[in-house]
Design a protein with these regions (language model features):
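Amphipathic alpha-helical interaction segments
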Residues: 58, 62, 91, 95, ...
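Short acidic alpha-helix initiation/capping motifs at coil-to-helix transition points
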Residues: 76-84
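Short, surface-exposed acidic
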Residues: 90-105
């Protein structure tokens, strides 16, 4: 199974996402569609949460611009779900554990399904746009950069 991991090339995510915080390099990410602001009625300048162009870290819930598609084992995948369940319960006020688990499983499954459409070890970015009463997601794909044995 494939999933997303954060790629930090420099300190720009820390600066861009200073309000929400940046995900850590190598942290598991989810698509983060559940955390998209309502862009209707808000000017682009006022929409400073950057939710339309970022993924969300599973551990620290910081944002990330570039994600790498990588393999994830079943144990790590289950840990992703458990962290999301705790986040939905503790931070977002899910009404029940069952509701939190259902949404966490849905978010993890969506991210895994998304990753299956890409080759392993590519980098992707997201751009979300409102339309037809929903948020549409468009992904750009980039080959992972390497210098010697070092990933860039």
């Amino acid at each position: 199974m494939k999933f997303l991991k954060a790629v930090l090339l420099d300190a720009s995510d820390s600066q861009v996402y200073s309000r929400e915080g940046a995900a850590r390099d190598g942290e598991w990410l989810v698509s983060g569609g559940y955390a998209v602001c309502d862009p209707t009625g808000v000017t682009h300048r006022a929409l400073n949460c950057h939710c339309l162009t970022s993924f969300i870290g599973v551990v620290g819930r910081g944002r990330c611009t570039i994600a790498e598609v990588v393999e994830i084992d079943k144990s790590e995948y289950q840990q992703v779900i458990e962290r999301l369940v705790r986040h939905f319960m503790d931070d977002l006020g899910a009404p029940t554990l069952e509701a939190a688990r259902s949404v966490a499983e849905e978010e993890a499954a969506y991210t895994a399904e998304l990753c299956e459409s890409f080759s392993s070890e590519v980098w992707i970015t997201v751009k979300r746009t409102p339309g037809d009463g929903r948020i549409k997601e468009h992904y750009s794909v980039f080959k992972r950069l390497m210098i010697g044995s070092h990933k860039l």
